[in-house]
Structure formats: structure tokens, C-alpha cells
């Protein structure tokens, strides 16, 4: 009997997302329920954004939650390497195989040519897609241009008519017309594969039997299915899980909710409660009980109990469930967990240099730096009053700073400072106009340690969470303001 093998394959391009944890949990439970194996693979072909720091954060976040893997980049295994960036020769081999079989072809179109092609298609009211012009080139011309080293990508051929039947474990057969599919790029000009080629090759070579992924991938499933057909490989069972959503039913995003697993760890949530809550996202125990452990979920797991309605990720409900777990702890364990959470030596070493020179007794540390150990802060609204700025201007400035910080890739003091500086200059203000507001929002106080140092230490999710809290305290942002201010955002360098 074939061993069930599932996997999670996150990209190390930022903080570990709760959506990644959610999909990892369901893959883990499915594998363990069937006596199988759960694999961790790192999809790091985006060399500009992928970092080893983000990769380590993924490892740490999953292990904090209690989700472990039998094979992966850090533990090895018989199917490695487990980083896509280390599998380049493998992808080149299989991509060339597709070209040799006539299922893929070189495309020499420049970005400008592709832009013009799409613009013309849109002007005609057509769906923009690659028109296959490279297929009209003669073999001789293709060979000549390849020999000359002309930049090119490799695209896959797709049918122009008919439908692809996607067998989904949750929905049954889903029919998707082929005319919605583009001739997908499989290999980029830099020789690195795109998601589609790498995903299929890796899943096959690693013996993955079942793929549970987010439903946002369902529309592009025909491309993956076609690649399996081209290679002549057996396709894994497919399951497209419902997406996590904000309370307003929109797709879960960091603009409306903290989405980093690290944020919830820093906020003092229990990993057991976090897993419990993620397990209730579209799934329920046979007896409908709300509180259950990871092992209980594994023991009772059945995909038939997954609901397709968009599960709502609500921090208030998560907090309530976490409270249930906290209150059920023996008091000795509760005290031990509080101590472990609050007095993390690595975190304390980041804070200590900024506090030591400002206090005369240890008792002064908590009033000065207690905000480092809190989730949110409760600043007085009077702290946001400005002699130079109106209330509306204060909200606008803080909202623009929040938006710019959301797109910041490197969370370091210099880049944080440069981001705030860019916003204030775009509004023809000075940095000193913004800093008292940032002190109030981030520390809850009029003054403390350097707020820029504090933001770096607190991290992106906790910083953005407090900025959102401050903006809400001042009345929030209307839909009209949101639309107007987003136009300003686009003009900020």
C-alpha cells in the first residue's frame, strides 16, 4: 500500500503567514491520520525576495505551533535537496525534456512586445494572454537565436478549446475552459523555474501523494494537470482548501489583520490555542466541541468535515479560545509559561541597551519599557494633538506611514526611518512633525526610548498593529478618505 505523503512548500519572502500554518496543519493532520509523512519544502526561486532569515522564521513558527516534518532543508531526507534554489539542474533537465517532446517552446518576446500585445487584446475586448507567436518561428530561426544567446523564456503549450476536468477532493470534478489558460512560462530568462514547473517536478520526485493547497490555486490547476499529462506521471490527489477571510469576508490580509504567526507568539497566545483555532477554520470535530488538541484533531480528522464556506479569522474569537486554554492550565504551568514568554533572554538583550542608560533602579524599567512586553498600548488621545497638524492631517500622516511600512522588505532602523521620512516629505512636513505621533502610537507614552529603535525591536506586525489601533482611536479612515489617500500613496518614493 502506498504511503501517504503530503507537503507544505512556503516561500521565504517575509514573516510566516497564518495561512501557511493553516494549510500546513491540514496537510499534517491528513498525513498523520493515514499513518503517512509530512514534508517541508522551501520554494525560494524568487531570489530577490527570498532570505534565509525568513526561512528560519518558517521553521521556528511551525515548530512553535507543534507541527514537525520528517523531511526538509534542515533535517534532510532521501528526496533532497529541499530548497528549490538548489535544484536548478533538475528543473533544467525536465524543462528540456518538455521542449524535446514538443510540449514546450522557446519564446523570445521582449517585455515591450508582450505589453503591446496585451494592450491590443484589451482594446479588442479580449482576455490578455500570450498569442503563441513564437510557435510561428521556423526551427532554423529558433536554433539561430538560441545559438546567439538571445534572452528567452520557455513556455508550455496549452489547448485552445475544450475544458479541463479538475478532480477536487472537496468539490468533486470542476470544469475549467482551456481558453482561460495562458501559455505559462515554465523557465525564466535567468534559468530559474516558475512555480508551475518546479511544483510538479518536485511533487513527483518527492513522492507526494496528496496536495492540499489554498483554493486561490484552483483556477490555474489545469496547467499543473497538463504538465503531469505531458510527463506521463501519475497526478497526486488534489484538495483546494477554503481561504481564510477577515471578519468583513475579504481575503485575509495584513492591511486588516495581523497575519504573521510570529505576531501571535509575541502577543502571548498559546500554540495549542492557535492550532486549535486554525483547526476550526472550515472544519469541526465529530462531536462539535470547540476545544481540542492537535492529537485529537489527527485522531478524528476527515476531509469530509471541511466546509467550503470562507472561514473567518477573528482575533477576538481566537483570544476567547486562548483564554479557555490559559485557564485550564495548572497554576504552576501557567506561571512557567508566563516567565518563558516575558523573560526571553534573546529579546531582553535587544531591549536592555536602550533602557540601561535611562534608569537608576530596576523598578524604573517597567514604566519606561513595559510597552515592549504588551500586545497593544492605550495612549491618551491628547498625545496625538499637534500644533501644526489638524486631526485629519494626523490621521492621514499615520495612515500613509502604516501603508508604506506594510510594503517594507527589510525591517531595520535605517529603512524604517527612510520610509517615515519619505512620507513626511511628500506631505511637505518635517520628521519632527511625525515623531511625537509615532511615540504615542508605538509606546503609548509621550516619550520613552528611541521610537525608531523600538519599532525595529517590536517588529513589523506589532508595529503595524499599534498604528492601526492609534488610527482607530482617532476615528479610523472613511472609504472616501481611503480612496483619496491611496492616490497620495502612489506618489511617495
From Swiss-Prot:
Species this protein is from: Pseudomonas fluorescens (strain Pf0-1)
Q: What is this protein called?
A: Glutamate--tRNA ligase
GO terms for cellular component: cytosol
Q: What is its main location?
A: cytoplasm
* Recorded superkingdom: Bacteria
HAMAP family, alphabetized: Glu_tRNA_synth_type1
InterPro entries registered for this protein in UniProt: aa-tRNA-synth_I_cd-bd, aa-tRNA-synth_I_codon-bd_sub2, aa-tRNA-synth_I_CS, aa_tRNA-synth_I_cd-bd_sf, Glu-tRNA-ligase_bac/mito, Glu/Gln-tRNA-synth, Glu/Gln-tRNA-synth_Ib_cat-dom, GluQ/Sye
According to its UniProt record, which protein family does this protein belong to?
A: Belongs to the class-I aminoacyl-tRNA synthetase family. Glutamate--tRNA ligase type 1 subfamily.
Print the keywords alphabetically.
Answer: Aminoacyl-tRNA synthetase, ATP-binding, Cytoplasm, Ligase, Nucleotide-binding, Protein biosynthesis
Subunit notes for this chain? Monomer.
**Motif location ('HIGH' region)?**
10-20
**UniProt cross-references to NCBIfam families, sorted A to Z:** gltX_bact
**Motif residue range(s): 'KMSKS' region:** 251-255
Which residue ranges run through the membrane? none
Catalytic function, reaction form: tRNA(Glu) + L-glutamate + ATP = L-glutamyl-tRNA(Glu) + AMP + diphosphate
Q: Where in the cell is it found?
A: Cytoplasm
Amino acid at each position: 500500500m502506498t504511503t501517504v505523503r503530503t507537503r507544505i512548500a512556503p516561500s521565504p519572502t517575509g514573516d510566516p503567514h497564518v495561512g501557511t500554518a493553516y494549510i500546513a496543519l491540514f496537510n499534517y493532520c491528513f498525513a498523520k491520520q493515514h499513518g503517512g509523512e509530512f514534508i517541508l519544502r522551501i520554494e525560494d526561486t524568487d531570489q530577490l525576495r527570498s532570505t534565509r532569515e525568513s526561512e528560519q522564521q518558517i521553521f521556528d513558527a511551525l515548530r512553535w505551533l507543534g507541527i514537525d516534518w520528517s523531511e526538509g532543508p534542515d533535517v534532510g531526507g532521501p528526496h533532497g535537496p529541499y530548497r528549490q534554489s538548489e535544484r536548478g539542474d533538475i528543473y533544467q533537465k525536465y524543462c528540456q525534456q518538455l521542449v524535446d517532446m514538443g510540449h514546450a517552446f522557446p519564446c523570445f518576446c521582449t517585455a515591450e512586445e508582450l505589453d503591446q500585445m496585451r494592450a491590443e487584446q484589451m482594446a479588442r475586448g479580449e482576455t490578455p494572454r500570450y498569442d503563441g507567436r513564437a510557435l510561428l518561428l521556423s526551427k532554423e530561426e529558433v536554433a539561430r537565436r538560441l545559438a546567439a544567446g538571445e534572452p528567452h523564456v520557455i513556455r508550455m503549450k496549452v489547448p485552445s478549446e475544450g475544458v479541463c476536468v479538475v478532480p477536487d477532493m472537496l468539490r468533486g470534478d470542476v470544469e475549467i475552459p482551456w481558453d482561460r489558460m495562458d501559455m505559462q512560462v515554465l523557465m525564466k530568462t535567468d534559468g530559474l523555474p516558475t512555480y508551475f514547473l518546479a511544483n510538479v517536478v518536485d511533487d513527483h520526485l518527492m513522492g507526494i501523494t496528496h496536495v492540499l493547497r489554498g483554493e486561490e490555486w484552483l483556477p490555474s490547476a489545469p496547467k499543473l494537470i497538463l504538465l503531469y499529462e505531458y510527463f506521463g506521471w501519475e497526478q497526486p490527489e488534489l484538495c483546494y482548501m477554503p481561504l481564510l477571510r477577515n471578519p468583513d469576508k475579504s481575503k485575509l490580509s495584513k492591511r486588516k489583520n495581523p497575519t504573521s504567526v510570529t505576531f501571535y507568539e509575541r502577543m502571548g497566545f498559546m500554540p495549542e490555542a492557535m492550532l486549535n483555532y486554525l483547526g476550526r477554520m472550515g472544519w469541526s470535530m465529530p462531536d462539535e466541541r470547540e476545544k481540542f488538541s492537535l492529537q485529537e484533531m489527527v485522531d478524528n480528522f476527515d476531509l469530509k468535515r471541511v466546509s467550503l464556506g470562507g472561514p473567518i479569522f477573528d482575533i477576538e474569537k481566537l483570544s476567547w479560545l486562548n483564554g479557555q486554554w490559559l485557564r485550564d492550565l495548572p497554576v504552576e504551568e501557567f506561571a512557567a509559561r508566563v516567565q518563558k514568554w516575558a523573560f526571553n533572554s534573546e529579546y531582553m538583550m535587544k531591549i536592555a541597551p536602550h533602557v540601561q542608560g535611562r534608569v537608576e533602579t530596576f523598578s524604573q524599567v517597567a514604566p519606561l519599557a513595559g510597552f515592549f512586553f504588551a500586545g497593544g498600548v492605550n495612549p491618551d488621545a491628547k498625545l496625538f494633538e499637534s500644533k501644526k497638524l489638524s486631526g485629519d492631517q494626523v490621521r492621514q500622516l499615520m495612515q500613509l506611514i502604516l501603508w508604506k511600512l506594510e510594503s517594507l522588505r527589510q525591517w531595520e532602523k535605517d529603512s524604517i526611518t527612510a520610509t517615515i521620512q519619505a512620507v513626511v516629505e511628500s506631505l511637505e512636513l518635517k520628521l519632527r512633525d511625525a515623531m511625537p505621533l509615532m511615540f504615542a502610537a508605538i509606546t503609548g507614552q509621550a516619550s520613552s526610548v528611541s521610537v525608531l529603535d523600538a519599532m525595529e525591536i517590536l517588529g513589523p506586525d506589532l508595529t503595524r498593529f499599534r498604528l492601526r489601533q492609534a488610527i482607530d482611536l482617532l476615528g479610523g479612515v472613511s472609504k472616501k478618505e481611503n480612496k483619496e489617500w491611496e492616490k497620495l500613496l502612489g506618489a511617495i518614493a
